[in-house]
Regions:
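Generic intrinsically disordered, low-complexity segments enriched for polar/acidic and small residues
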Residues: 1, 31-37, 211
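N-terminal positive-inside, membrane-proximal cytosolic segments immediately preceding the first
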Residues: 1-28
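Short helical patches
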Residues: 1-10, 37, 44, 173-176
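Generic detector of bulky aromatic hydrophobic side chains
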Residues: 3-4, 10, 14, 42, ...
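Generic surface-pattern signal
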Residues: 6-13, 62, 69, 185
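Primarily periplasmic coiled-coil/stalk helices
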Residues: 33-82, 164, 183, 190-201
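Periplasmic/lumenal scaffold domains of single-pass inner-membrane subunits
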Residues: 85-274
């Protein structure tokens, strides 16, 4: 009997020890789990913070790149003269077959043309050749229209340097504006002036100031202008001849209005250093 009681007491002590050990083990596991979870959570927060920062940087830099990709679209003065020359050459076959050019409009990617049959002329549908490509017309009984004609008006040295991630040096906005204002004040005829329609601005200035070392952080500003002048390429070339800062001017629109005698409205931008 005494032996049974002794065994029961020993068994109770063992159980108490086992319970105590289990409790200690649970506490240790809990502490380890807590520190592991805390460390894991901290690492996840650091990872998420890093990802957010990287995304923020990427978005800012993409915004800068997108701004200048758009800013550098257009034709430089040399390319403008080439396009006007092609417009004048390409209208000759249509004029010789009884049509007159009523309207055209070009942007950096494409042009639209409209020709109207002259009085007493015989209608004849025909393709239009433009920069060695042939375009079929949409026609009615007295009109020929050509749409989506490749304009080649998106060529300039600024976009080439930009696409090669090279340095670009431009005149300051104060010097360029001073020149335009001075030039305009010396001209009496509106067709001899460069009309500023929007002063220079930069929609990504804050991003550029945050990431000045980014390869596309040029610190440029973009203004808008128009010019009303003859679409004769020689006359247009004379208009721009000798003007300084020509690299800063890009042409984005070219429109011959209806009922005008070979007069064209240039729409463009001027880019300068702030």
């Amino acid at each position: 009997m005494n032996k049974f009681i002794d065994n029961w007491k020993s068994s109770g002590k063992i159980k108490n020890i086992a319970i105590g050990a289990s409790a200690i083990l649970i506490i240790i596991i809990g502490i380890c789990a807590y520190f592991y979870y805390s460390h894991y959570t901290e690492q996840e927060e650091l990872k998420l913070a890093k990802e957010r920062k990287e995304k923020q940087i990427k978005n800012a830099q993409n915004a800068i790149t997108d701004f200048y990709t758009k800013a550098f679209e257009g034709a430089n003065i040399t390319q403008l003269i080439k396009v006007l020359s092609e417009i004048n050459i390409s209208r000759i076959p249509l004029q010789e077959t009884g049509f007159y050019e009523d309207y055209y409009s070009c942007n950096p990617n494409e042009c639209d043309f409209k020709y109207v049959l002259k009085d007493n002329a015989i209608f004849n549908s025909q393709n239009k050749l433009f920069f060695e490509k042939s375009y079929e017309p949409i026609f009615s009984d007295k009109e020929l229209s050509y749409t989506n004609v490749g304009s080649l008006m998106n060529q300039n040295s600024l976009s080439e340097l930009f696409n090669q991630d090279k340095d670009i040096n431009l005149v300051s906005c104060s010097d360029l504006l001073n020149y335009i204002y001075s030039y305009n004040s010396s001209k009496k005829q509106v067709n001899d002036k460069i009309i500023i329609t929007s002063l220079p601005e930069n929609s990504v200035a804050s991003q550029e100031s945050s990431y000045p070392e980014y390869r596309h952080s040029y610190g440029f500003m973009v203004g808008q202008f128009t010019v009303n002048h003859s679409d004769n390429p020689f006359v247009m070339e004379t208009f721009w001849l000798g003007k300084p800062f020509q690299k800063s001017f890009l042409i984005t629109g070219l429109t011959k209005m209806q009922n005008t005698k070979n007069m064209v409205t240039l729409e463009g931008k001027f880019i300068c250093k702030k």
